């Protein structure tokens, strides 16, 4: 569709597409085309998304000068995650059963209401709402859950122990890009509820919301990152990640690793002692452009293909 664009028109559309191209000129673009200069990794991934091309193929097959320093920074970040996960594993619910585990993903094909009992769903829902400092009225009804799941906009990842007890979980939802400001304002006021939002359509830009960033065993931590990486590689409509955390920066530094930006904060009064929780936004290109993530993709997806969502 954009093959016949002139250079001027293409540059204008790139500037309109993302502020990272705000200073792009015809001269700079010409140097890129001639191979005299190279755009940053972030801009390269943005261009791939702009043309709706396959990001996995691009990262696998493009030579990218990977910084050992940045890979070490990512590895150090992951070591902290594993430490936090080990701590959570010993204190979380069902922590007394630390044997064999299994992970199940509930999505539009394998919906949670058809495959999990009511009490377990209630437990998951109450935990997510509690971690966000929301009231029970924010919990989705069975019909709302099914509606959002069947549309592909709500996913539950659940980590079971050997006795089928829930050891850890993570809930992800997709929201319309145009709802971002409303979402943040409702979050700040602890009044998030699904009835304020419409589901994103199949051709609408959106963001992915990770309801609570909770880590556990190394197996779980790597599974969550793998699923997030694959989701972002498949879906060019997702423009950024939004997640909430109560952890201080010295324990979970999403800023220096992924250029995460705090866009909101609130006090969570749902615990015996109130805690401050932060809402953090990460651009997809900053996440996938991290040299540790690029190294992960190049090492783990050499002979694999990931189909893009339509």
Enumerate the predicted regions with their spans:
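Short basic helix-loop element that most often maps to the first helix and adjoining turn
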Residues: 1-19
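A short helix-loop-beta-strand connector motif used in the catalytic cores of GNAT acetyltransferases and
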Residues: 3, 146-160, 178-180
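Recognition helix of helix-turn-helix/homeodomain-like DNA-binding domains
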Residues: 15-39
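DNA major-groove recognition helix of helix-turn-helix/homeodomain DNA-binding modules
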Residues: 40-60
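Short, charged recognition helix plus adjacent turn
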Residues: 59-92, 310
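Short amphipathic alpha-helix that is part of the acyltransferase structural core
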Residues: 79-144
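Conserved beta-hairpin
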Residues: 152-173, 184-188
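Acyl-donor binding region in acyl/amide transferases
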Residues: 182-265
């Amino acid at each position: 569709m954009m093959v016949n664009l002139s250079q001027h028109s293409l540059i204008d559309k790139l500037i309109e597409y993302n502020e990272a191209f705000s200073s792009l000129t015809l001269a700079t673009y010409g140097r890129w085309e001639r191979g005299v200069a190279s755009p940053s990794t972030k801009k390269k991934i943005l261009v791939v998304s702009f043309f709706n091309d396959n990001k996995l193929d691009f990262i696998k097959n493009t030579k990218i000068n990977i910084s050992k320093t940045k890979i070490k920074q990512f590895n150090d970040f992951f070591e902290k995650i594993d430490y936090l996960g080990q701590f959570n594993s010993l204190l979380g619910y069902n922590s007394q059963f630390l044997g064999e585990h299994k992970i199940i993903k509930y999505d539009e094909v394998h919906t949670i209401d058809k495959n999990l009992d009511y009490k377990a769903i209630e437990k998951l829902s109450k935990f997510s709402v509690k971690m966000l400092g929301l009231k029970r009225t924010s919990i989705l009804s069975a019909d709302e859950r099914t509606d959002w799941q069947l549309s592909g906009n709500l996913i539950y990842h659940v980590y079971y122990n050997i006795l089928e007890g829930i050891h850890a979980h993570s809930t992800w939802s997709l929201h319309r890009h145009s709802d971002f400001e409303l979402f943040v304002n409702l979050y700040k006021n602890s009044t998030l509820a699904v009835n304020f939002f419409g589901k994103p359509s199949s051709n609408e830009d959106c963001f992915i919301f990770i309801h609570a960033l909770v880590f556990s065993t190394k197996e779980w931590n790597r599974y969550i990152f793998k699923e997030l990486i694959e989701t972002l590689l498949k879906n060019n409509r997702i423009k950024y990640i939004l997640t909430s955390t109560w952890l201080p920066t010295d324990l979970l530094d999403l800023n220096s690793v992924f250029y995460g930006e705090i866009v909101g904060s609130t006090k969570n009064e749902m615990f015996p002692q109130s805690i401050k929780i932060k809402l953090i936004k990460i651009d997809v290109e900053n996440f996938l452009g991290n040299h540790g993530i690029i190294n992960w993709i190049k090492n783990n997806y050499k002979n694999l293909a990931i189909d893009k969502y339509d």
